[in-house]
Amino acid sequence: MIVDNFKQIAEILPEAENPRDSMFLIQLVVRHKDGHLDAANGNNRNRTVRSYQINTVEELLNKEKEIKALCDFFRARAYININPKNTVEVLLKQMELIHQSLVCMWNGDHKVMLRGTLDGALARTGEDDVEFGDVDPQDLALIQTLAEKRHRTWVVDCDDISIVDDVRERINNSRRSIDKVIVAEIPTKSGLHFITYPFDHVTAFDGLEEKLEIKRNSYTLLYFNDEVEGYIE
């Protein structure tokens, strides 16, 4: 099975007026359940083998062949977080993490530290999700308006194909103040990722909580190919 979402992601990736103001994180991940018996890292059964930081759709498409080749070689999956990260905020967070490492008397490879602190800064920047400082989380209209303006999305992970239509209908019928809540539907190996703006998920998904996972500030699938040698069913 091959899942290639490059074209679809390129169509929804937000473009900043100044591309250097924002960046997006791509990770190539090997997973234990894909046949990587050595993928475990502590309690984490996944391992990142390569990361990319891109600023534009053009950069994404320029990296497409390279990313696909590396995924096929390592038997990895490529994931992308389509929530833009503010470049200045990322650099400030990285400086904070570097300072913490030095205070703790880091004595390892400094290249590893720089790479690790950048990945950590990218992962942690934007963790405020849709709360936006002093905005009352109950003010759904304001939250949705700000989310649409700032390109802040959720990933609704649905691994049960039999309920996809029901989930889509519930999201579309949810209480909202913007015209469209669903930004895109991204295929995965076992189901679908609904890329959405924030909505009243508690009411919308009543009775489906155990079948869905809502991921804020998270990744969606960019590329997957288990037709190369080495994958397990």
Task: Tell me what each language-model feature is.
Residues E210-K211:
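Polybasic, proline/glycine-rich intrinsically disordered low-complexity segments
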Residues K215-R216:
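Short, cationic low-complexity segments
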Residues G191-Y197:
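Catalytic nucleophile-His microenvironment captured as a short glycine-rich beta-strand/loop
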Residues M1-T188, F199, F205-G207, T220-E233:
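Signature for HUH/AEP ssDNA processing cores
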